[in-house]
Amino acid sequence: MHNYKKISILLILSTLILSACAFPNKEKTENQVPAKDQLSMVQTAVDEYKKASGGLLPIKDRDDSYSIYLKHPVDFNKLKPKFLSQLPGNSFENGGIYQYVIMDVDKDPKVHLIDLRTSEVLKDIRIRIDASGKPLQLGKKVAPNVYEIEYKKYGFKKQPTVPSPYSNERLPVYMNGGNDFVIDYRLDLAKAIKKEKSLPKPGQDIRYLLYKDSPILPAYSPEFTINSKNEPVFKSKVKKY
């Protein structure tokens, strides 16, 4: 009986140790919250770097295959230590869950965030699809160049979703004809539209509504617009993701 208790205690301790190891630095509270002070700190550093370098920005070079939201990640190596004493706690480079990126690089460079938890979910979905050994099959057409995933063929119990960075919603994951994942932000866009006093025009890309009051960008999203009923819809011609 004494030995049984010792074994039980050892098992409990082992479980606790493994649990602690399973949550790296990115699980710390300061590494998860898109804190305004951290964002402001990086924005100030970017502005100072731009001024000191004659208009250049501290960004990593990426080609046109990347979407506008993922194309210009902040290069912290260019900011430390002269313009930034320490990396923000919630940055990917410091074990956090956010990728710092810059938007509107030509006119008014602003620092924003990409929630990398979304990327992790998409990576897991890709691994499961590839591991199935079955050729990719697109399901029901949702919009031009946007299709459901034939999830049952790849071992999923239901249509894949990702947690929204803007709400408590679960957002559907689809694919385009180029074998890329796209995320359907219409649930969040519908809420954003209701808050607007001046509605956008049909045909206008309305994704900006999502980061109008949030530092987080809608990564992996096709373009969305508004229809005659003021509902968010996929744009008829999808080009960049």
Residue ranges and their predicted role:
Residues I59-V121, S132, K140-Y241:
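Extracellular/periplasmic head regions of type IV pilus-like filament subunits
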